[in-house]
Swiss-Prot record:
Gene3D superfamilies linked to this entry: Cysteine-tRNA ligase, C-terminal anti-codon recognition domain, HUPs
NCBIfam families for the chain: cysS
Family: Belongs to the class-I aminoacyl-tRNA synthetase family.
CDD domains documented for this protein: CysRS_core
Motif ('KMSKS' region): 266-270
Motif ('HIGH' region): 31-41
Full protein name: Cysteine--tRNA ligase
Main location: cytoplasm
Protein's cellular compartments: Cytoplasm
GO biological process, one term: cysteinyl-tRNA aminoacylation
Subunit structure: Monomer.
Amino acid sequence: MALRLYNTLSGEKEPFVPRVAGKVGMYVCGVTVYDFCHIGHARAGIVFDMIYRYLRFSGYDVTYIRNYTDIDDKIINRANQEGTDYRTIADRYIATFDEDMDRLGMLRPTIEPKATDHIEDIISIIQRLIDNGHAYAVDGDVYFAVETFPAYLKLSGRNLDDMLAGARVDVDERKRNPMDFALWKGSKPGEPWWESPWGKGRPGWHIECSAMSMRFLGPSFDIHGGGKDLVFPHHENEIAQSEGANGCQFVKYWLHNGFVNINSEKMSKSLGNFFTIREVLELFDPETLRFFILQAHYRSPLDYSDQNLREAQAGLSRIYEALAALDQALEKPATAIHLPASAAEFAEKVAGLLPRFREAMDDDFNTAQALGTLFDSIRTLNRLLAEGGGSSSASRADLEQLRAAVTEIGAVLGLFRIKPSDWLAAREAEKARHLEISPEEIEGLIVERAAARKNKDFKRSDEIRDYLLSRDIQLVDTPQGTAWKVK
């Protein structure tokens, strides 16, 4: 089936028809660079990296823009706290963000603009809004007049009158309407500023994204993404100011990923349940975090806990164990591969894997279902390899086809990037760190056991095996040698 995606604007799944056939323009709101990124940022990054990869896999020429908000109240406050310049703070946390994204296996977007590089674009749009009657200047500030834009709140589905009635908005007598939002903020002592027709000042947050997206994608483009928390006010305000300035539809499809909860509670600094990406990666490898995030549909809430991460790592290990067995089987000569003569089920699973993967991904990027199809094939593979039986050259072709399909799926999801034996060895080493025995000692005992067996000293061989078992180390003898794993 053709790609369908859930559009926040309509509240429905819609067929994906880009404005220009074969080309996609996609803008995703990046981070405000004043601190280390948390796992909510990791989810947004991984989700839209997956979408970017799948669109390219589907044959689209994608221009992917993700910005840095490098001027904002939070950045200024952090700079003042540290007694430094806002640019020092922004540059520091741009660098740490890039490091985090690289560790999580992200593809770099086509362009990663900084807000401060587009001040002239921002001023131009604000002036156009004033000229169009959608904005007004007062005492060096410029505000968007929400009542001049009848479609305001069309993305979130809120009602302006209801919001005004129950508003917790600080009353500013200079505003025509309490819901009017800042496009330009007049300078205050100790703050960075730029010259403008309304005096020295700096841009508001919302106008920055409109300016950067329009600069690289034009006044109207295909996909705008971000976290669910950005629907209001950020994306709502982007629509108002962009369509008010240009007189045309700003974005065709709005995509929003769900929240991350911590042990079933919403993640927040005030609750003290706030984890940075770096803190998580001290406990779990990057691919496990990526796999954990992709196990859920991108719009669903995601409950983060150490237990859920451990379960995700166990699931990823099952795939890597199957891939290691598959690679081992494919290293044998074709005539040495023994598979059940009744391997028709496996052949059917393999032939259908990529089509079923595409079907799941075409259904609003349903990675949960897509991974389910992969696990289905892996289970059949494990059963097949365990049974043994007759041999077939066609069965080898099925194994090769499965390996190629998993590699292709991995490229779309950003998974299975590591040699299976290396990944499994790293996980065993992690487990061994919590044992009273080192990997080096284990390997030394394996060498000693091999020598004992060669010399037919089976008593010593059994003693070594039993000793390791008492330390929760299980030995696995294979034609290629002896491996070990933590029980």
